[in-house]
Design a protein with these regions (language model features):
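Conserved, structured C-terminal
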Residues: 5-7, 69-309
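Conserved phosphate/anionic-ligand binding catalytic regions in large, soluble enzymes, centered on
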Residues: 13-21, 153-157
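Short, conserved phosphate/pyrophosphate- and ester-handling motifs at nucleotide-, phospho-/glycolipid
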Residues: 14, 25, 115
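Residue-level detector of beta-strand structural context in well-folded domains
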Residues: 19, 51, 64-65, 259, ...
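Internal amphipathic helical hairpin motif
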Residues: 26-60, 117-145
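Short, basic and Ser/Thr-rich N-terminal targeting/leader segments
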Residues: 4, 15-17, 46-47, 59-62, ...
Length: 309
């Protein structure tokens, strides 16, 4: 965690458990724009966007990143737990022609290179990365396979994600962990991924997002195309229950999923994600609340931690 946040450090994480689905064809963009929640019509080649696959009730089947690799080629990265459902849904809705799917989950290495020094070290591997802005990408064509490098991540810090074949992925992993002088690169795992995304205020499918929760209830309406956003508002005008982000004012044991939230003596919600921020030592996370609350209110709400408010 701290390797990502500190000035002269960075980390690398193996994200190859995530799904990898390629979509191509003359009608790929049009079809994906109908299938997914964000506005794909504004996504240019060499860019990426965060989006959702929704059910008929507006609930989130999965959240994913879409990378536009070319005019007619897209890379979709769903969660590991949702890749089968996402792919099955796509197959069921696939048109008869002009759109092609390739599920390469498990055969593509995905590496997350995150932290303040990630740009400096990635430049040594490929100087082209210095031209990438946030959410931009480029494709490196190789003799046997291509590699995608994107300036994306889910940590709240600067970083990159690499998609390549297994052999090349191993070589890149080993090179990044070598001694690079003033730049320190550490390996990190899913535990650090979780505390980093919580600290940054990023939701996780299965905790803050599920098939009964709309993006509006999760506070993620800005990732919806306007027409869909209006449709979801009409379906669920009250938007309750909903997800909120919290920060504890005092140092406590770590808040955990399932801990109860109170306003006075009234239980108003439960924690969906929580941890101690390694930077502040205080509890942060998300909660599912059942009533309207005053955001940024200080001292009016209590968290029940280990039988103590």
């Amino acid at each position: 965690h701290c390797s990502v946040r500190r000035q002269r450090q960075m980390c690398i994480r193996d994200s190859s458990h995530m799904g990898v689905i390629f979509v191509s064809g003359a009608m790929a963009r049009v079809w994906l724009n109908e299938l997914l929640a964000n506005d794909l019509s504004i996504l240019d080649t060499g860019h990426s966007q965060y989006t959702f696959l929704l059910n008929d009730q507006g609930g989130v089947m999965d959240d994913l990143i879409v990378y536009r690799l070319g005019d007619e080629t897209f890379l979709l990265v769903p969660n590991a737990s949702g890749v089968d459902l996402v792919y099955e849904t796509m197959v069921k809705q696939l048109p008869d022609s002009d759109v092609f799917l390739e599920n390469r989950s498990g055969s593509v290495v995905s590496l997350a290179v995150q932290g303040r020094k990630s740009l400096a070290l990635m430049e040594r591997m490929n100087p082209k990365v210095k031209h990438l802005q946030k959410n931009e990408l480029f494709v490196c064509e190789g003799d046997r396979d291509s590699m995608v490098i994107a300036r994306t991540g889910y940590t709240g810090s600067d970083g990159f994600e690499i998609f390549t074949n297994i052999e090349q992925g191993k070589q890149i992993w080993e090179w990044l962990l070598k001694d690079h002088g003033s730049i320190q690169c550490s390996a990190c795992g899913l535990g650090a991924r979780d505390t980093l995304r919580i600290e940054a205020g990023y939701p996780l499918y299965g905790n803050e997002l599920d098939s009964s929760m709309t993006p509006l209830q999760a506070g993620l309406g800005f990732f919806l195309k306007p027409s869909l956003k209006n449709e979801l508002k009409a379906m669920n005008p009250e938007r309750l229950p909903r997800i909120v982000y919290y920060q504890l004012l005092e140092k406590t044991p770590p808040p955990r999923s399932g801990y109860e939230i109170y306003e006075g003596d009234e239980k108003i919600g439960v924690v969906t994600s929580g941890c101690l921020s390694p930077l502040t030592g205080k509890g942060v996370g998300f909660a599912l609340v059942q009533k309207e609350i005053t955001l940024n209110d200080i001292g009016n709400y209590k968290l029940f931690v280990r039988n103590k408010k």
